């Protein structure tokens, strides 16, 4: 809104980037008004692009530009991962999740799923991220009898995040739509986990299916379905070969479809054209 008002005051064109919450919790009339007024808009998922195009009088203004990863600034992935299969109590499978402790991340559903895992499987869960539901989630883990297996690391610097990705065996994100309509787009952490060589279990929420294809480069279950999530986790825990297969395919998907460079190049080109157009108009 501030950019739009400043542009109107100066008589300049303006552009906008929409992500997730701003798409799904904004009033449709407000989004439509801004889309009619801007020069162009970008968003980071096809699902979001379709929503904005439906609201825009000029659907061609809305472009899909995935965030992607800047591979040059990421640590090299681990070449060898432990082949834990959950059979050794002294060497449990490490399950990692990263994200804010808020409703749309589905951590309550994930704890329910972990509690449903077969007693014969040995695992431990690590979580990275801050958030308003921290105390509630810890209390839930206590009630479910899994608190001793759960480590809540809180917010961590990037170096520690990638260290956690390196030591984990499996990444899980149980995203869902929150009661207020907020939902994820395509969480970057999924692409980061894949780049680091981790296999992924997630949900069909939001735009996750634009990256993870169930049964090809990971496993997806319906959002909020703790029993299905537990079954997918158990399958991954007990089959290190399957984890390796999915991890390899997910990493290839990241490398071939989700490079940071393509999106930056498009945005730079569009901004450059706007500047040149204004310069010609001022002559």
Question: Can you annotate each of these PLM segments?
Answer:
Residues 26-30, 53, 69-86, 90-91:
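Acidic anion/phosphate-binding donor-loop and adjacent secondary structure
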Residues 47, 68:
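Carbohydrate-associated surface elements
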């Amino acid at each position: 809104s501030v950019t739009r008002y400043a542009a109107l005051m100066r008589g300049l064109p303006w552009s906008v980037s929409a992500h997730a919450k701003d798409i799904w919790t904004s009033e449709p009339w407000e989004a439509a008004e801004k889309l009619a007024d801007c020069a162009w808009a970008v968003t980071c998922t096809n699902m979001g692009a379709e929503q904005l195009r439906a609201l825009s009088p000029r659907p061609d203004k809305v472009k899909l530009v995935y965030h992607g990863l800047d591979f040059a600034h990421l640590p090299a992935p681990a070449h060898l991962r432990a082949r834990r299969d959950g059979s050794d109590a002294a060497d449990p499978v490490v399950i990692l999740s990263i994200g804010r402790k808020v409703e749309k991340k589905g951590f309550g559903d994930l704890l329910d799923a972990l509690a449903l895992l077969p007693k014969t499987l040995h695992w431990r869960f690590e979580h990275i991220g801050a958030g308003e539901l921290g105390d509630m989630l810890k209390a839930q883990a206590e009630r479910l009898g899994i608190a001793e297996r759960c480590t809540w690391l809180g917010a961590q610097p990037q170096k520690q995040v990638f260290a956690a990705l390196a030591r984990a065996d499996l990444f899980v994100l149980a995203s869902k739509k929150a009661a207020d309509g907020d939902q994820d787009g395509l969480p970057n952490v999924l692409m980061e986990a894949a780049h680091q060589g981790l296999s992924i279990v997630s949900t069909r929420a939001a735009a996750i299916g634009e990256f993870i294809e169930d049964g090809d480069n990971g496993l997806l279950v319906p959002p909020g379905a703790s029993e299905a999530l537990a079954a997918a986790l158990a399958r991954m825990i007990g089959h290190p070969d399957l984890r390796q297969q999915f991890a390899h395919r997910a990493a290839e998907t990241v490398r071939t479809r989700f490079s940071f460079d393509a999106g930056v190049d498009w945005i730079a080109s569009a901004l450059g054209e706007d500047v040149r157009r204004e310069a010609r108009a001022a002559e």
